[in-house]
Structure formats: structure tokens, C-alpha cells
Curated annotation (Swiss-Prot):
Site (Important for substrate specificity): 299
InterPro entries, per the entry: AtzD/Barbiturase, AtzD/Barbiturase_RUA, AtzD/Barbiturase_RUB, AtzD/Barbiturase_RUC
Active site per database record: 146, 215
Family membership: Belongs to the cyclic amide hydrolase (CyAH) family.
Region annotated RU B, chain positions: 97-232
EC top class, as a word: hydrolase
Name used for this protein in its record: Cyanuric acid amidohydrolase
One of the Pfam families matching this protein, by short name: Amido_AtzD_TrzD
Domain remark from Swiss-Prot or TrEMBL: The monomer structure is formed from three repeating units (RUs) that share the same structure as one another. The monomer, the active site and substrate all possess threefold rotational symmetry, to the extent that the active site possesses three potential Ser-Lys catalytic dyads. It is possible that any or all of the three active-site serines may act as nucleophile (albeit only one can do so per catalytic cycle).
Oligomer and partners: Homotetramer.
Length: 344
């Protein structure tokens, strides 16, 4: 179990490491970082090399056992930024605190990506991390996963081995990898059963996790996992609450979370949310065009829409909004987690 604090800073480019100085100013160092979660200013799709640049830059700075989640796409009012989750033992509130557990899966075989093998790998690792942090499923407020995707090269290797990959479409592989990882989280936390997950992979079950936030990228071949939960046994500066937005306009869910933060005397530090274009093609009975825009991926539209809503409600544009919410909340919606600071 690691009690954590968050140090956040906006970035001027994907390779901006000014957060290192901000950490020092706050009395921390890079050695204290257990996870780095950032939004980079790329397109969030397969060829988003802003993630790769950020990953390459920070890999030389952070401890070897720290996990990184670089999510591309800062459309609309979203600000590129980085949040360092740091271990802390500073004096804190007397009861209950946010703790983190971080880890990685083994490399996901190309043939397993988007399939049951990936579900099992993520589920097993999430279970281990929850046990390490002494977190029950009800204590967990976010499971953030960065997972791999299929590239042209990896697809070719798979075919050369005589194995058909889950898809030959690199963009579709992003969604399939997110889906498998989300289902793994849901299985690990008892939100769904393994047969439910198998049915969902076949498109036969509409099941989802209320705390999974999954992003995929070409900069890794394993899954980086960050589990956040409130531990009644821990003392620390932060706590978290979470809810599930029913659609991209669901301000009520967010306002309810902010009311809970206020009732606890808290100050919002970070918001982490998933967003997607409603696959039905409509929102509350009105047609939307996010799925039929040939110029922009629907994930970019969704990030801009949900990012604007959340930034307006919270009063901060340096928030984490990730597009593509397959099995992460209901269709068209997505989980949202608010991390806040409490008085010591």
C-alpha cells in the first residue's frame, strides 16, 4: 500500500519535464513517483507520436518501477499536462486516504491482443494489485490502464507465424485492446463474470466497469496499471469519489460528486474521465454527427465535448479526459473520478 499525493503541472510540449522542478518545489523528487499520468497534444489515434515522445523522455527520468500513462488528445479547452502520483508520509487527515498500487502485466502476445488472453492478464494483475494494497472492490475508485495496440509490423509478424490477429485494422485494434482491458478490470473487481467477458468479446453482452479507464498506444507492449482506492487504514492528503456519466451531457453526476467533495471539506486536485460518442448516433433523442465525421475520429469529438463540460464545472482545464470508452461505463457514457485534497 502506498499513500499518495498528486503534483500536477501543465506542459509546453510532450517532452516538457518542468514537472521535475515542480516536484522539488513541493518537497518531492522523481524517486517518489509511483505513476505519471499525462495528456499529450496529439490526435490520440494510432499515429499519435506525442505519446511516444513523452514516453521516451520520461523513461530516462522516472524510477524503473514507476508506471506511465500517456493519453493523446487535448481537443477543445483541454490543457496538455502531467500529474505525478508520489508516495508520501506527510501528516494528513486522521481517517481514510487515497492509496495506490501500480504494476505491469507481462508483454501481451500479439495474438492475444483484444482477446481473452488479454482479459485474463489484466484481471490477474489487477487482483494482485488490489491485494497488495489491501483494497476491497468497493474501496476502488479508479483502475487506469495503458495497453498496447496492433501496428502494421506486429500484424505482419502475427500473420507470418500463421496466426490471424483479432483485427488487421490498426485503429480498430485500439478499441479492441481497450475493450479487453476494461473487461479484465471488471472481472477482477467482480463487476462481471468471466463468461460475461467472453460474451462481450463476441459482441453478445452489454457489460461494463464503473471504474475502468483504459487508453491504448503504440509505445508499449505490456499493460501499465494504476489502481486508486480509499483505504480506511491509511492516513494521507487525498481522497477520491467516482460516478458514472450516463452520456456526454451528464452534468448531474459530476455535480453530485463535487457536492460530496464539498461536504467532506475537500478541494479538487484532479478529475479523470472517459468519453465516447454514443454508438446509437443520438444523445437524449437528438442526432449527433460524431460518428459520421470523415475528418475527425469520434474519440476526438468526445474528448472535446466531455472535456468542455468537466472543465467548466470544475474550473480547471488541466484534467484527464480519455476518448474511447468500450465497456467503460454505459454506451455513450463513462466513469469519472474526482481526486481531492482534505484538510490535515
Amino acid at each position: 500500500m502506498t499513500v499518495v499525493d498528486i503534483v500536477k503541472r501543465t506542459t509546453s510540449s510532450p517532452d516538457d519535464t518542468a514537472l521535475v522542478k515542480t516536484l522539488a518545489d513541493a518537497g518531492y523528487s522523481t524517486a517518489d513517483v509511483v505513476a505519471l499520468v499525462a495528456k499529450t497534444e496529439g490526435n490520440g489515434c494510432v499515429n499519435d507520436f506525442s505519446r511516444t515522445l513523452a514516453d521516451h523522455t520520461w523513461d530516462a527520468v522516472l524510477p524503473a518501477d514507476a508506471v506511465t500513462v500517456f493519453s493523446g488528445g487535448t481537443e477543445g479547452v483541454l490543457s496538455p499536462h502531467a500529474s505525478a502520483f508520489v508516495g508520501t508520509d506527510r501528516p494528513a487527515a486522521p481517517e481514510g486516504a487515497l492509496v495506490a498500487a501500480v504494476g505491469r502485466t507481462a508483454s501481451i502476445p500479439i495474438a492475444d491482443l483484444g482477446r481473452a488472453g488479454q482479459v485474463r492478464a489484466v484481471a490477474a494483475r489487477v487482483r494482485e494489485l488490489c491485494a497488495d494494497a489491501a483494497l476491497e472492490p468497493g474501496d476502488v475508485h479508479l483502475v487506469l490502464v495503458k495497453c498496447p495496440l496492433l501496428t502494421t509490423e506486429s500484424i505482419s509478424r502475427c500473420l507470418a507465424d500463421g496466426v490471424e490477429p483479432a483485427t488487421r485494422d490498426t485503429l480498430r485494434s485500439m478499441a479492441m485492446s481497450r475493450a479487453a482491458s476494461a473487461l479484465g478490470v471488471a472481472v477482477a473487481l467482480g463487476e462481471i463474470s468471466e463468461p460475461d467477458a467472453a460474451a462481450a468479446l463476441r459482441g453478445e453482452a452489454d457489460v461494463w466497469s464503473s471504474v475502468a479507464s483504459i487508453s491504448s498506444g503504440a509505445e508499449l507492449d505490456d499493460c501499465h496499471i494504476l489502481v486508486l482506492g480509499n483505504s480506511p487504514a491509511a492516513h494521507g492528503p487525498l481522497r477520491a469519489v467516482h460516478g458514472v456519466m450516463r452520456d456526454a451531457m451528464d452534468a448531474r453526476t459530476v455535480l453530485d460528486l463535487l457536492d460530496r467533495v464539498s461536504a467532506d471539506g475537500g478541494e479538487v486536485v484532479q478529475v479523470l474521465a472517459k468519453a465516447e460518442a454514443d454508438p446509437s448516433g443520438s444523445i437524449r433523442g437528438r442526432r449527433h454527427t460524431m460518428l459520421t465525421d470523415s475528418d475527425l475520429s469520434s474519440t476526438r469529438h468526445a474528448r472535446a465535448a466531455v472535456g468542455g463540460l468537466l472543465a467548466g464545472l470544475v474550473g480547471d482545464s488541466a484534467i484527464y479526459v480519455s476518448g474511447g470508452a468500450e465497456h467503460q461505463g454505459p454506451p455513450g457514457g463513462g466513469p469519472v473520478t474526482v481526486v481531492y485534497r482534505v484538510a490535515s
